[in-house]
């Protein structure tokens, strides 16, 4: 029978890395939006309106992506904690 081993520190590191990526993505998206906002300020008429519509869709999709990544990071972390707790309980049964 193969022995099952968990790397709890590795699981938590993965969750933290995903959360760090969420922060980086958010910063990059904000930076890009600020640059585009400066450019869009020079536009007028229907071109500006069309841009605003696309920007709103982009913002909604970016928010959805970041929320999904945050949920993934939280779920991985919670699963790691639950597995560590279970491991501790099982170990305690044999101590």
UniProtKB/Swiss-Prot annotation:
Effect of gene knockout: Bacteria no longer translocate from the phagolysosome to the cytosol of host (human) cells; bacteria replicate only in host phagolysosome rather than cytoplasm, decreased apoptosis of infected host (human) dendritic cells. Bacteria missing the RD1 locus do not gain access to host (human) cytoplasm; complementation with the RD1 locus restores access, but if EsxA is missing the last 12 residues cytoplasmic access is not restored although truncated EsxA is secreted by bacteria.
Record note on what altering residue 26 to A does: 16% reduction in liposome disruption
Description of post-translational modifications: Upon purification from strain ATCC 27294 a C-terminally truncated peptide (missing residues 85-95) has been found; it is not clear if this is physiologically relevant. An additional unknown modification on peptide Thr-86-Ala-95 has also been seen.
Pfam families named among the record's database cross-references: WXG100 (PF06013)
Organism whose genome encodes this protein: Mycobacterium tuberculosis (strain ATCC 25618 / H37Rv)
Protein localization: Secreted; Secreted, Cell wall; Host cell surface; Host cytoplasm
Coiled coil: 8-39, 56-87
Protein name: 6 kDa early secretory antigenic target
């Amino acid at each position: 029978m193969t022995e099952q081993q968990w790397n709890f520190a590795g699981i938590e590191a993965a969750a933290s890395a995903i959360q760090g990526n969420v922060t980086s993505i958010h910063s990059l998206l904000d930076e890009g939006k600020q640059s585009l906002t400066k450019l869009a300020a020079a536009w007028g008429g229907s071109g500006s309106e069309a841009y605003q519509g696309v920007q709103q869709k982009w913002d909604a999709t970016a928010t959805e992506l970041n929320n999904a990544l945050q949920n993934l990071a939280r779920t991985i972390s919670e699963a790691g904690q639950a597995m560590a707790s279970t491991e501790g309980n099982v170990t305690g049964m044999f101590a």
